[in-house]
């Protein structure tokens, strides 16, 4: 919706090897409802309708919300909670600003970054499991490019790094070298 900047429809169509998954979320903001439908492989389609709040959004919009926040307003330790709409549930996502740091990004160089610790809570409450945090480093400039994500797993951790960028809206002032 161009007036409110709220999502009207979210679709996902995943094909990875032999795995397929399709989902669609249709938002009705005046009624504060979202109708979801999803299908794995050739199994029957599932549907569910759920209530929304002002801080409910799909994963892509949630990430955009985090990137569009004014970095000057962040205070170390400050936390915000949003709600992430998934196919059959709404999860609470808490993110906390950890501070600014210089971060070396593999094959990209050094950057001034904004570091966030994130946790996904249960759908029933704001219950967050200790030790389940994952971390996101965004470029400390107007672009707020996601540079690195680190998430612990049972043995070790998963790391994702940016491998390139182009067509940035603003100059990349966070790059040191």
What are the residue ranges of the model-derived segments?
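Hydrophobic, well-structured mid-protein blocks that either form specific transmembrane helices
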Residues: 23-69
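Acidic, serine/threonine-rich low-complexity disordered tracts
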Residues: 1-29, 72-177
């Amino acid at each position: 919706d161009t007036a409110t900047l709220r999502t009207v429809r979210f679709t996902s169509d995943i094909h990875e090897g032999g795995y397929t998954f399709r989902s669609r979320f249709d938002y009705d903001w005046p009624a504060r409802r979202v109708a979801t439908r999803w299908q794995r492989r050739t199994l029957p389609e599932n549907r569910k309708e759920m209530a929304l709040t002002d801080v409910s959004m799909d994963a892509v919009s949630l990430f955009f919300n985090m990137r569009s926040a004014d970095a000057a307003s962040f205070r170390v330790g400050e936390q915000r909670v949003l709600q992430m709409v998934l196919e059959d549930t709404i999860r609470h996502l808490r993110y906390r600003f950890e501070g600014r740091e210089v971060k070396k990004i593999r094959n990209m160089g050094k950057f001034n970054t904004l570091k966030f610790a994130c946790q996904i809570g249960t759908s029933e409450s704001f219950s967050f499991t200790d030790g389940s945090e994952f971390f996101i480093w965004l470029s400390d400039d107007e672009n707020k490019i996601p540079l690195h994500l680190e998430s612990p797993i049972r043995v070790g951790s998963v790391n994702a790094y940016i491998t390139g960028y182009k067509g940035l809206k603003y100059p990349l002032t966070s790059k040191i070298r």
